[in-house]
Protein backbone atom coordinates (compact mmCIF):
# COMPACT_ATOMS: atom_id res chain seq x y z
CA UNK A 1 0.00 0.00 0.00
CA UNK A 2 1.16 3.51 -0.79
CA UNK A 3 1.89 5.71 2.18
CA UNK A 4 0.35 9.12 2.75
CA UNK A 5 2.24 12.24 3.69
CA UNK A 6 0.99 13.99 6.81
CA UNK A 7 1.73 17.72 6.86
CA UNK A 8 0.52 18.48 10.39
CA UNK A 9 -0.64 16.77 13.57
CA UNK A 10 -4.19 17.31 12.24
CA UNK A 11 -3.30 15.05 9.29
CA UNK A 12 -1.97 12.44 11.72
CA UNK A 13 -5.34 12.52 13.49
CA UNK A 14 -7.05 11.81 10.16
CA UNK A 15 -4.63 8.95 9.43
CA UNK A 16 -5.44 7.38 12.80
CA UNK A 17 -9.19 7.89 12.27
CA UNK A 18 -9.12 6.25 8.83
CA UNK A 19 -6.50 3.52 9.10
CA UNK A 20 -6.26 2.95 12.87
CA UNK A 21 -9.65 3.47 14.47
CA UNK A 22 -11.43 2.60 11.19
CA UNK A 23 -13.94 5.43 11.61
CA UNK A 24 -14.89 4.98 7.93
CA UNK A 25 -14.89 1.18 7.93
CA UNK A 26 -16.41 -0.20 4.72
CA UNK A 27 -16.81 -3.64 3.19
CA UNK A 28 -14.35 -4.84 0.57
CA UNK A 29 -17.07 -4.84 -2.10
CA UNK A 30 -17.56 -1.06 -1.94
CA UNK A 31 -17.83 0.31 -5.49
CA UNK A 32 -18.51 4.08 -5.26
CA UNK A 33 -17.47 6.70 -2.71
CA UNK A 34 -18.36 10.40 -2.63
CA UNK A 35 -16.05 12.51 -0.46
CA UNK A 36 -17.13 16.13 0.12
CA UNK A 37 -14.22 18.11 1.56
CA UNK A 38 -11.50 15.66 0.55
CA UNK A 39 -8.72 17.65 2.22
CA UNK A 40 -5.34 16.06 1.36
CA UNK A 41 -6.74 12.69 0.29
CA UNK A 42 -6.18 10.54 3.37
CA UNK A 43 -9.74 9.22 3.57
CA UNK A 44 -9.73 8.79 -0.22
CA UNK A 45 -6.58 6.68 0.07
CA UNK A 46 -8.33 4.52 2.66
CA UNK A 47 -11.29 3.94 0.31
CA UNK A 48 -9.04 3.34 -2.72
CA UNK A 49 -7.18 0.62 -0.83
CA UNK A 50 -10.36 -1.28 0.16
CA UNK A 51 -11.23 -2.51 -3.34
CA UNK A 52 -9.28 -2.32 -6.61
CA UNK A 53 -12.50 -1.50 -8.49
CA UNK A 54 -13.82 1.33 -6.28
CA UNK A 55 -14.37 4.70 -7.95
CA UNK A 56 -13.96 7.70 -5.65
CA UNK A 57 -15.48 11.13 -6.37
CA UNK A 58 -13.55 13.86 -4.56
CA UNK A 59 -14.55 17.49 -3.96
CA UNK A 60 -12.02 19.93 -2.51
CA UNK A 61 -11.82 23.73 -2.92
CA UNK A 62 -8.51 24.65 -1.22
CA UNK A 63 -5.59 24.86 -3.70
CA UNK A 64 -2.90 23.77 -1.22
CA UNK A 65 -4.99 20.76 -0.20
CA UNK A 66 -5.54 19.84 -3.87
CA UNK A 67 -1.80 19.68 -4.56
CA UNK A 68 -1.23 17.55 -1.47
CA UNK A 69 -4.20 15.33 -2.34
CA UNK A 70 -2.74 14.63 -5.79
CA UNK A 71 0.64 13.80 -4.24
CA UNK A 72 -0.96 11.44 -1.71
CA UNK A 73 -3.01 9.67 -4.40
CA UNK A 74 -0.24 9.15 -6.99
CA UNK A 75 -0.82 5.86 -8.75
CA UNK A 76 -4.59 5.98 -8.28
CA UNK A 77 -5.39 8.68 -10.87
CA UNK A 78 -7.55 6.36 -12.99
CA UNK A 79 -9.72 5.46 -9.98
CA UNK A 80 -10.69 8.85 -8.67
CA UNK A 81 -12.27 11.99 -10.08
CA UNK A 82 -11.36 15.28 -8.43
CA UNK A 83 -13.63 18.30 -8.77
CA UNK A 84 -12.01 21.48 -7.48
CA UNK A 85 -14.94 23.06 -5.66
CA UNK A 86 -16.84 23.21 -2.40
CA UNK A 87 -20.24 21.61 -1.82
CA UNK A 88 -23.19 23.48 -0.39
CA UNK A 89 -26.91 24.11 -0.56
CA UNK A 90 -26.56 26.82 -3.21
CA UNK A 91 -24.50 27.00 -6.43
CA UNK A 92 -22.26 29.89 -7.28
CA UNK A 93 -19.10 31.52 -6.00
CA UNK A 94 -18.77 32.02 -2.26
CA UNK A 95 -16.16 32.97 0.27
CA UNK A 96 -14.54 30.02 2.02
CA UNK A 97 -12.56 30.34 5.22
CA UNK A 98 -9.71 27.96 5.92
CA UNK A 99 -7.00 27.91 8.55
CA UNK A 100 -3.34 27.02 8.13
CA UNK A 101 -3.59 23.23 8.47
CA UNK A 102 -6.23 23.07 5.72
CA UNK A 103 -8.27 20.56 7.72
CA UNK A 104 -10.84 23.00 9.03
CA UNK A 105 -12.82 25.46 6.97
CA UNK A 106 -16.17 26.24 5.55
CA UNK A 107 -18.33 28.37 3.33
CA UNK A 108 -19.21 31.84 4.50
CA UNK A 109 -22.68 33.14 3.67
CA UNK A 110 -24.51 34.80 6.53
CA UNK A 111 -28.09 34.40 5.31
CA UNK A 112 -27.94 30.87 3.91
CA UNK A 113 -28.82 27.94 6.15
CA UNK A 114 -26.10 25.25 6.53
CA UNK A 115 -23.29 27.59 5.50
CA UNK A 116 -20.46 28.07 7.97
CA UNK A 117 -19.61 31.60 9.11
CA UNK A 118 -16.09 31.96 10.45
CA UNK A 119 -13.38 34.46 11.16
CA UNK A 120 -10.56 32.10 10.22
CA UNK A 121 -7.06 33.04 9.14
CA UNK A 122 -7.65 32.95 5.40
CA UNK A 123 -10.59 33.59 3.11
CA UNK A 124 -10.68 32.55 -0.56
CA UNK A 125 -13.45 32.63 -3.15
CA UNK A 126 -14.45 29.18 -4.41
CA UNK A 127 -16.87 27.60 -6.83
CA UNK A 128 -19.73 25.83 -5.03
CA UNK A 129 -21.93 23.02 -6.37
CA UNK A 130 -25.20 21.88 -4.79
CA UNK A 131 -24.85 18.61 -2.89
CA UNK A 132 -28.17 17.18 -4.13
CA UNK A 133 -27.27 17.85 -7.78
CA UNK A 134 -23.84 16.26 -7.38
CA UNK A 135 -25.27 13.14 -5.74
CA UNK A 136 -27.99 12.82 -8.38
CA UNK A 137 -25.34 12.97 -11.11
CA UNK A 138 -23.13 10.33 -9.49
CA UNK A 139 -25.87 7.97 -8.37
Residue ranges of model-derived segments:
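Phosphate/nucleotide-binding beta-alpha loop and adjacent structural elements of enzyme active sites
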Residues: 1-139
Amino acid sequence: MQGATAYSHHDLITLVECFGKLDYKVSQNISVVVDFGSNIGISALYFLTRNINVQVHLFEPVPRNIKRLRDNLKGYENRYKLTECAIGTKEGKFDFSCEDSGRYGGLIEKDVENFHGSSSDRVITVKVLMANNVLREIC
